[in-house]
Amino acid sequence: PLAILSASLSIMHPSLYNASHQAMQQLSEWSATNDPKMAAALRHWPTIYTNISMIANRSAPLHRDLQSHADWYDMLVSVSNYSECVLDIPSLGLQFDYWPGTVVAFSGRLLRHGVNDVSGNCCSLAFYMRDNIHNWLGVPRSDWMRVPLVSQALAGM
């Protein structure tokens, strides 16, 4: 199922997908020589994103994700069994029902966001990339996503 996130990113932000794909390839090549345990783990890594964090049974006050880059899309995936959770993005004046199974992609650095405290077992997975990993690997940073880039990507399919 996590391959769907990577495939979604390839449509929503093709240049970010390509940059991350290049980063993961280079990381695999580097680790094959320098860190066999990392190489073994990367063979089973489920997504194009370089980082995954799990947030369990807690609210997330409004914040920005400063380790990411403003023009990159992070993905939040909610799982578990809970109700009445709201994802708040106040700078856009948006509040979303954040039910189990919801996937949201946006710039976690650019947009302040947070979720309320809920009853039940609440778990979210945050998929993101770290600028320092891309810089260390020498992978060029992707550009801002623009509508013409999506049109070009879809035309090439």
Question: What are the roles of these predicted feature ranges?
Answer:
Residues 1-70:
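Conserved, ordered domain cores of eukaryotic regulatory proteins
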Residues 71-72, 81-157:
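Catalytic core of Fe(II)/2-oxoglutarate
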Residues 74-76:
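Conserved, well-structured core segments
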